[in-house]
């Protein structure tokens, strides 16, 4: 079986993809040459564009932290894949412990283009001791705080390896709530947060 390499595009400028999909971080390239994009169109549905050959792999990669997206359609409206919905519940914003210290201003600007109300914010969380830990969606959470939302929507999922470490490091830096995360320029974010993550995961290989 041929190995499949999936690269998720983390920039906001790429002529191969729609801007809306780029803003949602729903763009991928398989084996360096096959472009795919997934564009969320409602709270539980998305459109997928690209060669049908790798649909399953792209959808599975996309849903790693987006299990609330359960219906995937082709561009002509054909249902491609359907999943069982997770249990979604209201969660007070001030009860969430982040696993991230910083927010990228450029990503925040992108998120503002598609987050307009509470219903647009559904994030994966894990129970940790007596708290809920946010596993993804920190930019959306920060925007919720800035918009004055008192709660968002969430679903329980499995924590990732190293969750304990990221929680500990967040608290050590005084990041104990969504409002404590620090907004940085895109350049500073890459230098501080990306570097921190790279060094952590590199240490696991030693």
Feature locations, PLM:
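Basic- and aromatic-enriched surface patches that contact anionic nucleotides/nucleic acids
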Residues: 9-14, 18-21, 129-206
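Short alpha-helix boundary/capping and kink motifs at helix termini
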Residues: 2-135, 139, 145
